[in-house]
């Protein structure tokens, strides 16, 4: 299974690779400044799962029917807060 990580999530690469996933980052594809549309099209062309934390990019991916995992940063912040509040 191939995964394309959006720029802010590059740090997840080694963790996902340790689970056996084939990971490509926007940075490695020299698409760090690419428009969201280009990233979505690249993920569709390569039959990759597009992983992003960007709401606009996620909406665009849904419109194009791309395989998508949208990481909601507000939800993630709440999880961290709840863990720290214990």
Protein language model regions, located:
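Acidic, metal-binding active-site segment of PIN/NYN-like and related structure-specific nucleases
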Residues: 44-62
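Acidic, PIN/NYN-like endoribonuclease modules and their adjacent C-terminal/linker elements
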Residues: 1-19, 30-31, 37-40, 58-86
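Short secondary-structure boundary micro-motifs
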Residues: 21, 32-33, 52-53
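A local structural motif
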Residues: 25-27
């Amino acid at each position: 299974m191939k995964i394309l990580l959006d720029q802010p999530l590059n740090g997840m690469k080694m963790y996902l690779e340790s689970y056996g996933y084939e990971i490509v980052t926007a940075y490695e594809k020299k698409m760090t400044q690419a428009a969201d549309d280009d990233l979505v099209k690249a993920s569709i062309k390569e039959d990759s799962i597009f992983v992003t934390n960007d709401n606009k990019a996620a909406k665009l991916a849904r419109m194009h029917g791309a395989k998508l995992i949208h990481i909601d940063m507000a939800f993630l912040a709440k999880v961290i807060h709840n863990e720290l509040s214990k």
